[in-house]
Amino acid sequence: MKRGMMFVLGAVLLLAGLALLFGRPFIAEQAFRRALDTNVGVDQSAAFADGLHLYVCGSGSPMPDADRAGPSLAVLAGNQAFIFDSGSGSIRKLGRMGFPMGKLRGEFLTHLHSDHIDGLGESLLQAWIAGGRSSPLPVYGPEGTDKVVAAFNAAYQIDSTYRVAHHGPKVANPTGFGGAAQIIALPDGADSQVIYDQEGVKITAIRVIHDPVKPAFGYRIDYKGRSIAISGDTVYAPAFVAASKGVDLMLHDALNKDMVAALGAKLAERGQPRTAQIMHDIQGYHASPEDAARAGKDAGAGTLVLYHLVPPVPARLIEPLFLGQAPKVFPGTLKLAQDGMIVHLPAGSKAVEFASGL
């Protein structure tokens, strides 16, 4: 009896193994079909409530980071979408998050450091093709933005001719290629100015402190009673705090000086003086987590999210070390940005809801 049971059990296991082995192509195809139905061509934002929605597609810095792309954020306000900086790798993550490129109205550069613009070419390309543009994308930024945009347009010009020839003008309308620079020049003595005001969306450029990079800007976005402030790269900047009063959500850059100093010391010890010098220099023009927490507190921000994280924070175990005393300084919700994070601020509400878009 026992032998019979063992034989039956063995036969069942053998058949199950054979089914699994030879059924793999079928299972794989079904999984592929489900992924097509769920993700491809689906505007994930169509299910969002009216309001402001922040996409974190790049929470990292120039330092190599397997988990975080270069600095980039995107905002959806009703039917209008905007990108703030385009760090390396960020635009591909934004695509994975289902960002509605067809609603993109413009890109806003905080400043012209390479890590904030090295993905601009890809951003303009996606705006043109995926967004179906018939005119160049407006790119707002400080003095010099015209040179940067012209250079990216030139670099991608040959590629654009291939795409028009291959896909035709209905897919790649030649008049929609590239970017059109819009220079932000604040009046003398002014620390902030509204630079975009359309269909209920107001975007304010704010002077921040990132010397020797001048000018450098943060931005505030207002829509239907909800608000987001984005610092860009800066130390604690009183003008940014003043212009961010009462925001629902503040995004602020953060650099842990003790950790960066330790990196610099190790680099010097290992005979890399140039990189060690950079680790010393960058401490003077970024906010510490405590500085960012103070900015959020002084502005009365409801929620504070730290991004442009220096150095990389590869595991949650390290987050308390990176944050230092910041949680004691900022009285509200405080988080480290993660690529793929989406923050929902529904209109007519005080809610701040976190979700994952990856």
Give residue ranges: language-model regions.
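Cap/insert and terminal regions of metallo-dependent hydrolase folds
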Residues: 2-17, 217-218, 224-229, 235-339
